[in-house]
Every structure is written in C-alpha cells, then in structure tokens.
C-alpha cells in the first residue's frame, strides 16, 4: 500500500500523455511486476481517464480485472488450445513470444498459422526489436558491439541484451526477414502446380487486391528464370477473401 500512489501516478501520466494517439490500441499495467491491489488501483485510474480502450496485464492471468487475457511464450499447441476455447469471451494476446536471441526466433510461421485460424487470438509482440549493444573499439583496434561485462561492470547479464530482430544499427537479422515473410498481407498457396492452380488469400482489412497490386509470376528451372508473365487478379478481390487462380505455364523439363 505504501507504493500505491506511485503506481497510480505512473499509470495516469501514461494515459494522459498518449490517450489521443490513434495508434494506441489498449493499455498495459506493466511488465512482470507481480499482481496485487496496487494494480487494481492502477486499472481504476486508467479507466477513469480513458474508458474507450481495453486493458491487459499478463501477471493478472485470467482475473476479471483485465479485458484481454495474455501470456508469454506459450508453445504453439498451447496457443491453439487457447484459440479454441469457448468458455472465455475475452481475446488472447501474446505479450511476448519468439525470443529473438542467438539462433532465434523460431516457429514464427507455426505461431501465425495458429493465430490466423482463430478469431480469439490477437497476435503478439516478438521480444525484442533491437540488440542493445554499444559500438566500442576493441583491443585490436577494430570496432564491435559491447554488452554486459565489457565495461568492467559487475554483476551483469552478459549478452542477454543482444536479443533483437536487428543489430544496434538497425541492420536486419535473418529473423526479421522471416518475420516479414510471415506478416505478408497476401498469402499464396499451391493447390495443384501441375495444373497451375494456386490459392491466394487477401489478408488486408480494407484493401481490394485487384485495386492494390500489379501481379506477375515467374517459373524457374534450376534457379534460372524460364518464364515470367503478368497475372490478372480476380475483380472485386476484397479483404479476407480467398480465390483460386490458374497460372499458365509449361511444366519445366526438370519436372
């Protein structure tokens, strides 16, 4: 209780600062900060200042206080089970997933295949955007990114701050390129390639594909372009729709 006013003050200042920004979708009560009466006081203050946006807080679990249920790092199968639940009408949000450290992130396509199949699943936030290294000169005169322990600091978290989708200078890691592919607003799937049939899904919420894109397709044989043609997209290809289209091409010699 001694910290109640500090909790409430921080939440109130956040809402007053940002509530007129249309890009703010919902409010969070914090990150990995336990759960108790001070958080309930924060929620009351937030709702008194902005009753138009929902509230999430991972540490609250499924407590009635929150409008959005959230978790960190569930396995894909657990996420599918959450998406299939009918006993809780609140949406489900991955406030952290796909830790991008080292050889991560992983299972991006699998996560988003699950998310796309359930209206209950909102999506999620990859931890995290950028590595937190500082450009420093090494003993050999070359430059590299320094992190915990490189400054004589103790204790430290070592390279645990090097876990982003891009380098500190914002050069993309491979994981960011994979995430871009997963996020693409147009999905193309093979139906029967010997007959040239593919399935196209418009993932946009407001755009017709035929009014947005000029489409082409390319056939390659052993990495070399064998054919490239224009593709006329179906008329009125609206948001959320899926259409099958036929591509005209001869089968490559390689089969």
What positions do the PLM features span?
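Intrinsically disordered, low-complexity Pro/Gly/Ser/Thr-rich segments with frequent PxxP/GP/PP motifs
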Residues: 213-254
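Extended substrate-binding grooves/exosites of carbohydrate-active enzymes
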Residues: 1-199, 203-211, 216-224
